[in-house]
Amino acid sequence: MRIIDRIQHPDMLITIFHMNDKYIVKFEAGPMEQAFKFDTTEVKSVENLKLIINEAYIEEVRKRFNEMFLQYKAAFGS
């Protein structure tokens, strides 16, 4: 698996990897991460992938991170 690009964002690290005919987009925020796999035969290029990973997509990821953080925090009784 190798890093092929990054998407700039002020609140999270977004890294695009390539491995076995798949693009893997990893979002990282604090102690949590989310990863999404896209088949290279469907997406065709990193440029097309970046069109998919738009602000609306990133906003849904951010909402999920908020839910994950609440669950993480609850696990420690905070």
Spans of features found by a protein language model:
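Mixed-charge, Lys/Arg-enriched low-complexity segments
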Residues: 42-78
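N-terminal acidic leader/helix
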Residues: 1-34
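Short amphipathic beta-strand/extended segments with alternating polar/hydrophobic composition
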Residues: 33-41
